[in-house]
Amino acid sequence: TSYGTGELIKTALDRGCRDITIAIGGSATNDGGMGAMRALGIRFLDENGEELSGCGNDLARVADIDIRGLHGAVKDAKFTIMCDVNNPLTGPDGATYTFGMQKGGTPKILDELEQGMIHYAALIREKMGIDVDQIPGSGAAGGLGAAFSVFLKAEMKSGIETVLDLIHFDELLEGVDLVITGEGRIDWQSAFGKVPSGIGNRCRKKGIPAIAIVGGMGDKAEMIFDHGIDSIITTINGAMGLDEALERAEELYAGAAERAFRMIKAGMKLQDRS
């Protein structure tokens, strides 16, 4: 469960922290954030009034939410959540179907978890008066985004947008002709608030072309073209396994960069001819 994350937050609160920023993602959990909230004192009860542990298979069993034991310092604390995706809690683009398979979920398990997540979302709507599926990023980290937004009143911020603002990225773009970004593996998820889409959207606003050099391409990678990325160059130059690709990463990325710039040079020659 996400219980350990809640323990870290509790420790921070116990030590006097009142302005807490949490970057979420890569959780390996799909519990709707119940585990983390349990560590902070919230009780999730079944139909018999028994407290649940807050793991994924409890999503369908939770019948009531008791927030009376929530850590007393939460009301005086400001929580900011940095998140690199804007997926909702449920649905085809939600926490379970988007990220569940990479966490080991089989199709049968994913269907069961999704039904549990739908039930959990409905209970939150009933008890807290909040439709979590209307909160961008509520499906991040297996639903941690939803729990932080609802129970901690956290402000959700795009992780990449926050970082780009911190480094004054827009100012760095002044006088720039081309931006090159990258990702280990680019696929349809990359269009949902991840680094390439964040950078591409900023570049598009200023009319600056941007390309991505990536380790590999996955399903619907071309969706990134709607977010300011003009082209994708892969590093792989032949049949090879992941271990070899990682071992030769520096060499492969250098080769991909050279191919990218040769293509740009060819484009400049075409422009000269016109």
What are these language model-derived features?
Residues 1-24, 28-274:
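N-terminal loops that bind phosphate or other acidic moieties
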